[in-house]
């Protein structure tokens, strides 16, 4: 298991991609791409806009509060444990499996906030990874070599336990 040290948490508050105020604003950027969503609200908003994500990673919460917008997706469901502030091997294995066999929903018992990092590393070039930026909107990261390098750099800050 990898744990994000408390001293480095602020580094992860900056958007890891382009920040949009709403899903509707970024819809044209998703055309022809695999779409991967992290978070219940982002997934719900994509579905409301008519976009079914190829992979959704959800935990039933938004900003630590139970989410009444948890999306209902008809896709293979993988359930994993991932405590807050961590990236577990169970989560990364599920992400790898989901990327190989889309569509899939990964339901996280714990917290899915940091899943965007291993998701970018596992996603094929050209995929669109979206996640919520609390009280600001939605972040879109298009996967390419630079995105994977930045994700690997972020992962290097974590401590193996």
Swiss-Prot record:
<dbReference type="GO" id="GO:0015937">
    <property type="term" value="P:coenzyme A biosynthetic process"/>
</dbReference>
<keyword id="KW-0173">Coenzyme A biosynthesis</keyword>
<feature type="binding site">
    <location>
        <position position="59"/>
    </location>
    <ligand>
        <name>GTP</name>
    </ligand>
</feature>
<keyword id="KW-0418">Kinase</keyword>
<dbReference type="GO" id="GO:0016301">
    <property type="term" value="F:kinase activity"/>
</dbReference>
<keyword id="KW-0342">GTP-binding</keyword>
<comment type="pathway">
    <text>Cofactor biosynthesis; coenzyme A biosynthesis.</text>
</comment>
<dbReference type="Pfam" id="PF04019">
    <property type="entry name" value="DUF359"/>
</dbReference>
<feature type="binding site">
    <location>
        <position position="42"/>
    </location>
    <ligand>
        <name>GTP</name>
    </ligand>
</feature>
<feature type="binding site">
    <location>
        <position position="40"/>
    </location>
    <ligand>
        <name>GTP</name>
    </ligand>
</feature>
<comment type="similarity">
    <text>Belongs to the GTP-dependent DPCK family.</text>
</comment>
<feature type="binding site">
    <location>
        <position position="41"/>
    </location>
    <ligand>
        <name>GTP</name>
    </ligand>
</feature>
<protein>
    <recommendedName>
        <fullName>GTP-dependent dephospho-CoA kinase</fullName>
        <ecNumber>2.7.1.237</ecNumber>
    </recommendedName>
</protein>
<keyword id="KW-0808">Transferase</keyword>
<comment type="function">
    <text>Catalyzes the GTP-dependent phosphorylation of the 3'-hydroxyl group of dephosphocoenzyme A to form coenzyme A (CoA).</text>
</comment>
<dbReference type="InterPro" id="IPR007164">
    <property type="entry name" value="GTP-dep_dephospho-CoA_kin"/>
</dbReference>
<feature type="binding site">
    <location>
        <position position="112"/>
    </location>
    <ligand>
        <name>GTP</name>
    </ligand>
</feature>
<keyword id="KW-0547">Nucleotide-binding</keyword>
<dbReference type="GO" id="GO:0005525">
    <property type="term" value="F:GTP binding"/>
</dbReference>
